[in-house]
Amino acid sequence: MKHKPIFLLAVIVLLSACGQSYEEKVRLSRAERARLAQEEAAALKVAVLPTLDCMPVYLAKQKHWYDSTQVDLRLKVRNAQIDCDTALKGKSVEVAVTDLKRVEHMTKHGVGLLTLGTTDAYWQLIANRTARVKTAAQLGDKMVAMTRYSATDYLTDKALDGVKTSAPVFRVQINDVLIRLDMLKNNEMDAMWLTEPQATTARMFKHTVIEDSRKMKEHLGVVVAGAHLMKDKKRVKQLTAFVEGYNRACDSLNHYGVKHYADLVKAVCHTDDKTIDRLPKYSYPHIALPKQR
């Protein structure tokens, strides 16, 4: 019995220590979250897709081909262009690889954007081989996967301009580029617009190319940033460092070819060796910041 008070005291001290430890952990956890949030806000965030036009961004990040003292570069990977643009519009990213028609749509709705340059992105309208469609005129009563207010929506208009179909063409909004390709593989869609490397995979499975944006003389790929960034000297330094890294990646991709970076392409585009072996030549033009007054 003599030892009971001592035992109780030890328990109280232990519980107090545990309580202090828990409170300390909560405090540190809050401080850590605040620090991480601050770093995230200060970083230059770039929205990218699992497509070849985004390869300079992926490669620059992987190789650290930018001045890390000037920019903390963070990639925000999305499978749908509309998600990248929503992030850009909401300012949760500063830069995005997108298309000219999406830029026009966002600008029309009051989003200030700065075009850094173009990409070599192209889109092919590919029909499911089971649909027996060889031309745009045969798309009557067929479903075409695309994204509203985008390059694919615009290209659908152009492909059908002056074309007489036997019935209306049904445009189905499938924004996720990977799901879009899967729907073609699973015979769930009659036709769709695809860019690389998804277009190569579709051709590999003997699906039919009926239109090509290059033959239509349409060059719609762009890299854009929020226009408000140019008012912030720190952001301008970040963009300058990003542009330098991006252009260095372009030079390497143009020199060695995209197949040289097969492992990276497989990882970021969720594709395979067979597709990469069949990829056509792809060019990567430089981007630049506008001259400041």
How should these model regions be labeled?
Residues D232-R293:
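Secondary-structure end/capping motifs
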Residues M1-F7:
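Bacterial N-terminal signal peptides that target proteins for export
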Residues S16-A17:
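C-terminal motif of bacterial Sec signal peptides marking the signal peptidase cleavage site
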Residues T118-R129, M204-R235, L239-Y246, K281-H286:
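Periplasmic-binding protein-like
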Residues R180-M183, A202:
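Loop-centered beta-sheet repeat module
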Residues Q62, K89, K108, D161, ...:
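Sec-exported extracytoplasmic/periplasmic mature domains
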Residues S21-V172, M183, D190-E196, I210-S213, ...:
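Short, glycine-/small- and polar/acidic-enriched structural segments
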